[in-house]
């Protein structure tokens, strides 16, 4: 299994509607991309105060690295990317991606 983790610094004026649309777009990728097993999206709820400005995040569980690689260039993923960019804060490091 491969866990693809994405942290987002969303614009301060992000609306509840935009948040729901983003969640829906991400979760809808399940069943469309081979090997993508699960997508979880949420806003930061940590009480620790160590989020460094990251307000939202999601993770995706893939069967293996090959499935993750398919996702990276998959047309359905490419359709979601512009919406993610639209809700990001206007700063150079508004997104962080790691795979485990």
Task: Outline where the language-model segments fall.
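A common structural junction motif
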Residues: 27-30, 76-82, 88
């Amino acid at each position: 299994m491969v866990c693809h983790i994405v942290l987002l610094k969303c614009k301060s004026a992000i609306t509840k509607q935009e948040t729901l649309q983003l969640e829906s777009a991400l979760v809808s990728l399940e069943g469309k991309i081979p090997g993508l097993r699960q997508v979880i999206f949420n806003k930061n709820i940590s009480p620790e105060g160590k989020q460094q400005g990251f307000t939202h995040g999601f993770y995706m569980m893939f069967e293996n690295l090959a499935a993750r690689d398919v996702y990276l260039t998959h047309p359905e993923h490419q359709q979601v990317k512009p919406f993610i960019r639209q809700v990001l804060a206007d700063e150079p490091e508004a997104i962080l991606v790691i795979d485990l």
